[in-house]
Amino acid sequence: MSTPFPKTADKVKGVQILGPIPDEAKHIFNQETLAFVATLHRGFEARRQELLNNRKEQQKLRDQGFLPDFLPETEYIRNDSTWTGPALAPGLIDRRCEITGPTDRKMVINALNSNVATYMADFEDSLTPAWKNLVEGQVNLYDAVRRNLSATINGKQYNLNLEKGRHIPTLIVRPRGWHLTEKHVLVDGTPVSGGIFDFAVYFYNSAKEAIAQGFGPYFYLPKMEHHLEAKLWNDIFNYSQDYIGLKRGTIRASVLIETIPAVFQMDEIIYQLREHSAGLNCGRWDYIFSYIKCLRNHPDFILPDRSQVTMAAPFMSSYVKLLVHTTHKRKVHALGGMAAQIPIKDDEARNRAALENVTKDKLREVTLGCDSCWVAHPALVPVVLKVFNEHMKGPNQISLPPKEPFKPITQRDLLSPFVPGAKITEQGIRANIVIGISYIEAWLRNVGCVPINYLMEDAATAEVSRTQIWQWVTHGAKTDTGKVITKEYVKQLLDEEYAKLTKNAKPGNKFKRAFEYFAPEALGEKYSDFVTTLIYDDVTTIGRALPGERL
């Protein structure tokens, strides 16, 4: 009988691996896995490219003055109250506190030992996609799913807590976004999608084992800008489940609403994912980055210092309210935002103030109806749980009536840049410079999650840092003292902060290279869609090609 799936030997022809596969990873990166990667690439890459081209066309329209809005052609989906998402999946019913972080072994162990509901293992914003990081990350997740995880790091032993009766956080994997490629893996001479690669390797090796452990193949999907991008994922999910013999709907995907176009298409995104939908998440920093990026040609949409653009800002609050209303209407989770603070061990007063801000922020979210929130550090878990346990008595708030009547959210509500007391300060410019250069420097050293000024920063905050300065310079914004933010003024601040950063920097640092990337963006000389694509080639280690047939 014929099969829609070609033989493994045929599928791996044309596959080339341009990075080393260590012995401890060969059971994962085998012919069958790479054949699956190649099959998805050949079946779906053309559509990915079409969708990326659509992003460019949509940006051209925005540059011409056609601002983001609700789509008239999908109004019937938004207005149809009869459809909902699927029943909640095992391990994804109560998600009140989710910890996030990269996939290095220590992080995976610490996250799974935390008193949280889920752990989002990240191949995206908090991981530099160096080949070594990606391979080791897949090995770590393979072992995590099988509860076979330990490590000795700097003489200290780390073990997964397998105490009987203990809840081990549900594992959710975040693959890279549609815009990122994986240059270490070629299929028919073309680099594969980073997201498809991350998804395929994990899914093929661990989907069935995840089910055996009582959860399933669960994912977080980042940076989508159109509901058809969600449809592409849905089609990949259906094909993948058929490929390994799983029932459709076994996969579940939570979507980060972290772009301005996506906030106008939340109903449609849930609808496109259908039986695979597991809710929507508030991706604060990338959302602010997308706001600036999408509206960058328009001087009417200038934002103040990033420290002032909190979730209490009117346009950010509208975004959360609409997300909660939309998800609960469709019977899926409303997933709150990130608490990025890390403990300030040497200053009790500052640490207490930081934790009070976390409490206030999470109280706002749970009161608005959010079913969960993210933390970047285990020390914040008790703080967050105290708020959610007090104000959310059940496993979630999906079926509860809202505490306040929902007032329809308009295009103006979502786009208005008004922030009470808004101002741009020299301190804010300097902070953006320090964060941007420091993050890029760490990324170039293969570190994608970086503590800076007691906040855990990832690529999203670096994006905000560079785009804010670009916006201020490009449109001649003024500081609170009336000083026009010119290229010359920013150049002076750049030089001063760069000198401070390099004065006591450790040998082997990458500050010079980071400055070379950051400065042209901040000075308004160029604008890159993503800083991660701009600097990706610096962390690739392209080596001699290993044909798929020889794996």
From Swiss-Prot:
GO cellular component, one term: glyoxysome
InterPro entries: Malate_synth_C_sf, Malate_synth_sf, Malate_synthA, Malate_synthase_CS, Malate_synthase_TIM, MS_C, MS_N, MS_N_TIM-barrel_dom
EC number per UniProt: 2.3.3.9
UniProt GO BP: glyoxylate cycle; tricarboxylic acid cycle
Pathway: Carbohydrate metabolism; glyoxylate cycle; (S)-malate from isocitrate: step 2/2
Catalytic activity entry: glyoxylate + acetyl-CoA + H2O = (S)-malate + CoA + H(+)
Positions of the catalytic residues: R174 (proton acceptor), D458 (proton donor)
Cited CDD domains: malate_synt_A
Pfam families: MS_C, MS_N, MS_TIM-barrel
Single annotated GO MF: malate synthase activity
Keyword annotations: Glyoxylate bypass, Glyoxysome, Peroxisome, Transferase, Tricarboxylic acid cycle
Location within or outside the cell: Glyoxysome
Enzyme kind, highest EC tier: transferase
Family note: Belongs to the malate synthase family.
Misc. remarks from the entry: There are two genes for malate synthase in C.tropicalis. The sequence shown is that of PMS1, PMS2 differs at a single position.
UniProt name for this protein: Malate synthase, glyoxysomal
Organism for this UniProt entry: Candida tropicalis
Source taxonomy: Eukaryota, Fungi, Dikarya, Ascomycota, Saccharomycotina
Gene: PMS1
